[in-house]
Swiss-Prot record:
NCBIfam families the record matches: eIF-6, PRK04046.1-5
Transmembrane regions: none
Gene3D superfamilies reported in the protein's UniProt record: L-arginine/glycine Amidinotransferase, Chain A
Keyword set, alphabetical order: Initiation factor, Protein biosynthesis
Sequence similarity: Belongs to the eIF-6 family.
Family annotation (InterPro entries): eIF6 (IPR002769)
Gene coding for it: eif6
Pfam families the record matches: eIF-6
Stated name of the protein: Translation initiation factor 6
Protein task: Binds to the 50S ribosomal subunit and prevents its association with the 30S ribosomal subunit to form the 70S initiation complex.
MF-aspect GO terms: ribosome binding; translation initiation factor activity
């Protein structure tokens, strides 16, 4: 089982509420245990419930890879300590790093795997370099399909990538070279182009919004290297 449809309290926008890497999944608090178990079974990593300033939209606010997870600088110390404690319990060697910038929706503005990161051109060059240093990867500033919200417009793992359907062939080639995986265009949740908001994915599998169609699932599996 490497792909499953799921909803979070009837919302198909799973990526808004979580961050998935090859080491761990951070997900909003309050989900039913049976849904947490689906995520564990499909993504095959520990699933840790978390909040940021009591907000549930942690996929919008945070992002990361196996090396580090970036969170807004204003996250409460108690929330950071709770995540770090859970990481220690599971033996997860991933840093949690509050990142000081005027932009708080880090999950919307950063797209990353364990090989590279694409950050919105809204970030300064110095900020981009710092993000790359924290994540331990090569970093570039740019857009996808003319959009600054590169983290919402795409999803990328260490095996593949899927981005907004209006991305050009030139962008796909550039993204493939950057992330060192094949990158395709596609949608989820019955035509939603902001695929990063619709799913949680890592190299082991993907959970997608429950509105995702059969043809979309086939494309997602292909793009993320799961078939």
């Amino acid at each position: 089982m490497h792909i499953e449809r799921l909803d979070f309290e009837n919302s198909p926008y799973l990526g808004v509420f979580g961050v998935a890497t090859d080491r761990v999944v951070l997900v909003r608090e309050g989900l039913q245990e049976k849904k947490l178990e689906v995520i564990r079974e499909v993504l095959k990593v520990p699933v840790i419930e978390a909040s940021i300033m009591k907000s549930r939209i942690i996929g919008t606010l945070a992002t990361g890879n196996s090396n580090a997870i970036l969170v807004p600088w204003y996250v409460w110390d108690t929330e950071i300590e709770r995540i770090k404690s859970a990481f220690k319990e599971y033996g997860i060697e991933t840093e949690i790093v509050p990142f000081r910038t005027k932009y708080t929706a880090l999950g919307n503005l950063i797209l990353t795997n364990d090989k590279a990161a694409l950050v919105s051109a809204k970030f300064s060059r110095d900020e981009a370099k710092e993000i790359g240093d924290i994540l331990g990867v090569e970093v570039e500033r740019g857009l996808i399909a003319g959009l600054h919200a590169v983290g919402s417009a795409g999803v990328v793992t260490n095996k593949g990538g899927l981005v907004h359907p209006e991305a050009s062939d030139e962008e796909l080639e550039w993204l493939s070279e950057l992330f060192k995986v094949d990158v395709y265009v596609g949608t989820a949740n019955m035509g939603v182009p902001y695929v990063g908001t619709c799913m949680l994915a890592n190299s082991n599998g993907v959970v997608v919004g429950h509105l995702t169609t059969g043809p979309e699932i086939v494309k997602i599996e292909e793009a993320l290297g799961l078939i």
